[in-house]
């Protein structure tokens, strides 16, 4: 034990299968867990999920970089619109993304929208070069993103004369973002990878959802991997009392399928 050996596929598969059966017999299926890549195909995710659940385990997850799992049982998170619809947006607020690096193809579509007059806005740790004109950019350390987004929500509430979801201070930049979103016709609030991986991701999600609702915008998730949405469709994450990725990595299972 403790050493890597190069073997043929049959030997490797039998070794893994026997190991999983042993853990199931000694600790029930709950002793098993699976950390699956969100880049995997739908078939791979579905088969792995089916295997674990038939062995009695709900310890399955693809959210390997997430830190906040408190709202994991919500609706499927996706872009919220067809990809082609990005070209037709006239207002876009991106939260927590180096758009040009993280999502170059989506960035190109938003860039096309900007060329046709769309106002692009961002909340990030720093002002990134997205190779497109920016209407407004709010920079804050990641630990302050919840306060910053709450400020944008408060600015929206102030413009509309309604109660904000939480009381928060806001400045001119937040006011510019709020007014732009309220005046647009086709608009979106998009959460990037850094927002989804944030330690207060659920709070950012709730605030973004409120802003989108009150401004008539579509809420979307840019998505970190090729099959993030597919993983949700086949329930490759805990649906009952299973452990999430962070809990499994803390050593709460006896064996992990990677």
Q: PLM features: residue spans?
A:
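Catalytic alpha/large subunits of respiratory electron-transfer oxidoreductases
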Residues: 1-258
């Amino acid at each position: 034990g403790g050493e890597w050996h190069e073997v043929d596929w049959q030997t490797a598969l039998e070794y893994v299968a026997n190991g999983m059966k042993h853990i199931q017999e000694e600790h029930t299926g709950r002793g098993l867990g699976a950390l699956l890549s969100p880049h995997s195909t739908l078939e791979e995710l579905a088969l792995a999920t089916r295997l674990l659940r038939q062995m009695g385990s709900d310890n399955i997850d693809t959210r390997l970089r997430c830190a906040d799992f408190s709202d994991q049982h919500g609706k499927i998170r996706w872009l919220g619109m067809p990809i082609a619809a990005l070209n037709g947006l006239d207002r876009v607020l991106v939260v927590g993304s180096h758009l040009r690096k993280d999502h170059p193809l989506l960035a190109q579509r938003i860039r096309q929208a900007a060329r046709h007059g769309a106002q692009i806005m961002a909340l990030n740790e720093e002002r990134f070069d997205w190779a497109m004109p920016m209407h407004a950019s709010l920079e804050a350390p990641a630990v302050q993103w919840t306060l910053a987004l709450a400020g944008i929500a408060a600015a929206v509430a102030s413009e509309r004369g309604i109660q904000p979801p939480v009381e928060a201070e806001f400045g001119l930049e937040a006011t510019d973002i709020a007014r732009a979103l309220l005046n647009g016709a086709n608009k979106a609030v998009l959460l990037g990878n850094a927002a989804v991986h944030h330690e207060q991701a659920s709070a950012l999600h709730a605030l973004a959802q409120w802003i989108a609702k009150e401004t008539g915008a579509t809420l979307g998730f840019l998505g970190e991997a090729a099959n993030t949405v597919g993983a949700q469709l086949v329930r490759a994450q805990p649906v009952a009392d299973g452990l999430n990725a962070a809990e499994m990595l803390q050593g709460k299972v006896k064996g992990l399928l990677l």
